[in-house]
Regions:
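Structural alpha-helical scaffold elements that stabilize or flank donor/cofactor-binding regions
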Residues: 136-137, 194-195, 225
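Glycine-rich phosphate/adenosyl-contacting loop at the front of the ribokinase-like
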Residues: 2-90, 258-260
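Conserved N-terminal subdomain of the carbohydrate kinase-like
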Residues: 34, 66-148
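Hydrophobic anchor at the start of a short beta-strand
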Residues: 67-68, 94, 169-171, 232
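Conserved phosphate-binding/catalytic region of the ribokinase-like
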Residues: 2-25, 217-261
Length: 261
């Protein structure tokens, strides 16, 4: 049953470290990707796998041994069953919003050597209900990570603002905009920046900076700090990244692919 966020206690309940009872909460997308590949003889083969930026973040945290829960939109359909089973197999708590539109799908097709992604209507219609179970998870979480969220939806934006108490201590943002999923780029940027202004941590890639702000990554990084973000991680694929914060720390590392384990 969908609850009302204002009915929930506003008393902060987050603990300092994630535990099974108060895991890190990841909010965003969980979809199935169909990968089409060109065979040597010129034909196409396809395979599918569970994916989505929020699901991928969740899996990465689980592999590191971090207690984590996922909040995402899926359908009551075979793809939704597949996602549930995948998370259950890895012992990850899942608090879904079940969508009448179904579970989102992305189709990856080869184009000039690079994958070209298209998203179906269900992926574009992904929405989080912020029901009682989801809000309780968010309120108890030591950290709340956002990736692949529909920032261009005004209601989603407002519900997230209401749900995350003390964002300056807990909110971790990754816009991860995708062509074909962002329906209103102006609203997406405006609402994302509203969350950045009070976030603990914001991640931006060079692709994010170009797609959202039409600006170089360094410029967009400075803008995030000016908006109020406490920490910003700016990355350029395997070319490296830069961590800066409002206290004056500025650390840069080039060529991630050369890092030793």
């Amino acid at each position: 049953m969908q609850g009302t966020i204002r009915d929930m206690s506003s008393k902060p309940t987050a603990k300092a470290r994630p535990t099974p009872d108060a895991p890190v909460v990841v909010i965003g997308d969980a979809i199935v990707t169909e990968l089409q590949e060109t065979e040597a003889r010129g034909g196409l083969t396809s395979r599918s796998y569970v994916s989505g930026s929020a699901l991928n973040v969740t899996m990465a945290l689980a592999r590191l041994g971090v207690p984590v829960a996922l909040i995402a939109s899926i359908g009551d359909d075979p793809d939704g069953v597949r996602i549930r089973a995948h998370l259950r197999k890895h012992g990850i708590r899942f608090a879904p919003s079940v969508s009448l539109a179904g579970t989102g799908r992305a189709i990856s097709e080869p184009a000039d050597g690079e994958p070209l992604y298209t998203f179906d209507d269900a992926a574009r219609a992904r929405r989080i209900r912020f029901d009682d179970e989801q809000v309780a998870l968010i309120r108890a979480a030591p950290f709340v990570a956002i990736s692949g969220f529909a920032f261009d939806d005004k209601k989603q934006h407002r519900r997230l603002l209401e749900a995350v108490i003390r964002p300056q201590e807990r909110l971790l943002l990754d816009p991860n905009p995708r062509l074909g999923l962002v329906e209103d780029p102006v609203a997406f940027v405006d609402n994302f920046e509203r969350h950045v202004s009070s976030a603990l941590f914001t991640h931006l890639s060079d692709n994010d900076a170009d797609l959202l702000f039409e600006a170089p990554l360094d410029e967009a990084t400075s803008d995030m700090l000016d908006l109020g973000a406490t920490h910003v991680l700016a990355t350029e694929g395997n070319r490296g990244g830069r961590w800066v914060n409002r206290a004056g720390i500025d650390v840069q590392k080039g060529n991630f692919s050369s890092w030793e384990e």
